[in-house]
Amino acid sequence: MSLLSKTRELNTLLQKHKGIAVDFKDVAQTISSVTVTNVFIVSRRGKILGSSLNELLKSQRIIQMLEERHIPSEYTERLMEVKQTESNIDIDNVLTVFPPENRELFIDSRTTIFPILGGGERLGTLVLGRVHDDFNENDLVLGEYAATVIGMEILREKHSEVEKEARDKAAITMAINSLSYSEKEAIEHIFEELGGTEGLLIASKVADGVGITRSVIVNALRKLESAGVIESRSLGMKGTFIKVKKEKFLDELEKSK
């Protein structure tokens, strides 16, 4: 397969995910397929965002890493010290992705490391490993292209998260501001009683405790539910099950006191 064909295969995957979050496992599998390598896509904190492995599954340490979805902190630190592509790293180098304890299995192995950059900052690392055969120039071009694309996707996800947090905060603020004084007091008392983000509410108990009518509690909950801040489900005589949908709600409620 030519370099152009390999690049197109990676582009096809990204176009398939247009408008939705990219699954980095799919990205890793595509990179693995076109480069015939073991692949790790790692965040700057060492979280494994995506991987596609073959020969490395012979190592118990690698299997454990995959289960934990995290690489060791010391290896993460070493990766973050790599500022530009480093290719054809052998088994005796501390940057090798292959386990040194299985040196005899991976004596001819080669590791290549591509820093993932975006928006002027380091976002993670793309690590490719081969049991045999050096990485050639075409491999490096494809790897650097893949690292660039991954960086763009990580940035897009980060921006989406920031936008979602802003929307959630606005919805929470509007919901809290829509409550009357007595409704807000009722909501504060409800979550003090629950002691967390979800639990069972007995409206009559709260009404008696705060000294308000049950209808005030019902109206307050209805306002929060219509704003998408909480969800509730009647359990009949047992009460009402309440769950917070927007995680910053309780913090914002506390700040508004």
UniProtKB/Swiss-Prot annotation:
Give the record's keywords alphabetically. Cytoplasm, DNA-binding, Repressor, Transcription, Transcription regulation
Q: Where does it sit, as one GO cellular component term?
A: cytoplasm
* Region of interest (GAF domain), ranges: 1-155
Q: Name one GO molecular function term.
A: DNA binding
Annotated signal sequence is none
Which Gene3D superfamilies does the protein's record reference? Answer: 3.30.450.40, Winged helix-like DNA-binding domain superfamily/Winged helix DNA-binding domain
Among InterPro entries, the record links this protein to: CodY, GAF-like_dom_sf, GTP_trans_reg_CodY_C, Transc_reg_CodY_N, WH-like_DNA-bd_sf, WH_DNA-bd_sf
Q: Which residues bind DNA?
A: 203-222
What biological processes does GO assign it? negative regulation of DNA-templated transcription
Q: Where in the cell is it found?
A: Cytoplasm
The job of this chain, per UniProt, is described as:
DNA-binding global transcriptional regulator which is involved in the adaptive response to starvation and acts by directly or indirectly controlling the expression of numerous genes in response to nutrient availability. During rapid exponential growth, CodY is highly active and represses genes whose products allow adaptation to nutrient depletion.
Q: Which family does it belong to?
A: Belongs to the CodY family.
Q: What is this protein called?
A: Global transcriptional regulator CodY
Tell me what organism the protein belongs to. Staphylococcus aureus (strain bovine RF122 / ET3-1)
Taxonomic lineage of this organism?
Answer: Bacteria, Bacillati, Bacillota, Bacilli, Bacillales
The gene that this protein is the product of is codY
